[in-house]
């Protein structure tokens, strides 16, 4: 397919109907697929041929969405999963095993922090957390001989720190390991991490990519740029006995990482997305570019208002010139960051609660990044499993309100915020 600009790619990539075929991506709601001979089926199981034989490993609807995601990010392949957490876990387990080590930003989504801090530790994988604001020397000091990857979020949730992608990627490569980033908040419309040296991207597709809070899902996208032949990753360069001795780096070339994630981990873990969810995700992605433009313009307007209001103690939005991350945002996301703002109002945690309870248009929900404006208090919800010290290190203060600005008329959103501020600060 011709390489189009991102907004056109959102609509057309992944699925090209033939003569007399449906114009809209069909839902192939089937677990299995028929073939004329046992040999054809055997070749599929041995990875000697392309095709679908069981939806856990591939499905026409999922395949179209994966191709669209890969095209948007500029990668060689993608794998959709049942959730963003599944994508993060599989992205790491694909290259890191018991006895291994990961370097991870400490300013990440609470569930991601617990995955690295607790669950992977119980599986024998250690993690060293670093601040996304760390210096190059501090970052390099976190590596060990057993380090197998670096993980960070492009824009951290909910503290909205802009990660220096080139610094993290360069450090990873200097130690012979790939850099993985979660690109959920900016989406490939606003940031393409592969252009800055990142090797693997993950997404919670539940958020902006879907955009309507309809489907739960995740994705892994492979740039195809990392060289697995450096001696640190024998799982790619030595025979996999569970697939009759296939060597992923030889057989799949630049797509070795994403092929192994599908053939090995998805086979064994089974965290596959449902075809219906992939269909909804595709519908959402068709309007992604339009929605992100509105999310960002609305958020900019709201952030500028909050910055000037005396009842507001502080505001963090990378689009503001006053943000300490504005320069990095302009480097990595020059056309906009996302629709999420973090801020605190005078009166602390109690005032934050009164503010959220007073909102009429915006909803208080455990969600972020869909077309409806919503708010959340992360310290008592998404990050409540973290200690006070961990919250501080992650940039989640007790008064932090996470405001996910939707695509409603910005004046209506402003009116709602103004009346809630009035009630919260009486």
Regions found by a protein language model. Give the residues of each.
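Well-ordered beta-strand positions enriched in small/hydrophobic/aromatic, beta-favoring residues
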Residues: 150, 218-220, 315, 341, ...
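Basic/polar N-terminal segments that are highly enriched at the extreme N-terminus
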Residues: 1-9, 307, 422-426
